[in-house]
Amino acid sequence: MASKAILEELNILSSKIFGTQYKSNNSRTGRKFVVQELKGAKLKSYYPATINYRQLRTLLNDKTFPDSDEELRMEIRKGRIRQGKGASKSKKK
């Protein structure tokens, strides 16, 4: 009967020959999942792209839809300009 040391050396040698990973304690490493091809691009192409409100308005070429987020942004911007916190005059050109 072969000793444990000889069997371990045989396992190390066979893993080098066949290109497999040698694990002395037989633990799970998850290598099978790490080596697999990533599926992110396939899954992403399956679902349609999300479209936001601004893109919808440009697709429909209709400016009658009120965009509350844009209006709020412009309101805040005008308030900051009134307070003197807007862009400098050299940048407004």
UniProtKB/Swiss-Prot annotation:
Transmembrane segments: none
Places the protein is found: Mitochondrion
Primary location: mitochondrion
Keywords: Mitochondrion, Ribonucleoprotein, Ribosomal protein
GO molecular function: structural constituent of ribosome
Gene Ontology CC annotations of this record: mitochondrial small ribosomal subunit; mitochondrion
Subunit and partners: Component of the mitochondrial small ribosomal subunit (mt-SSU). Mature yeast 74S mitochondrial ribosomes consist of a small (37S) and a large (54S) subunit. The 37S small subunit contains a 15S ribosomal RNA (15S mt-rRNA) and at least 32 different proteins. The 54S large subunit contains a 21S rRNA (21S mt-rRNA) and at least 45 different proteins.
PANTHER family: MITOCHONDRIAL RIBOSOMAL PROTEIN S33, SMALL RIBOSOMAL SUBUNIT PROTEIN MS33
Protein name: Small ribosomal subunit protein mS33
Organism: Schizosaccharomyces pombe (strain 972 / ATCC 24843)
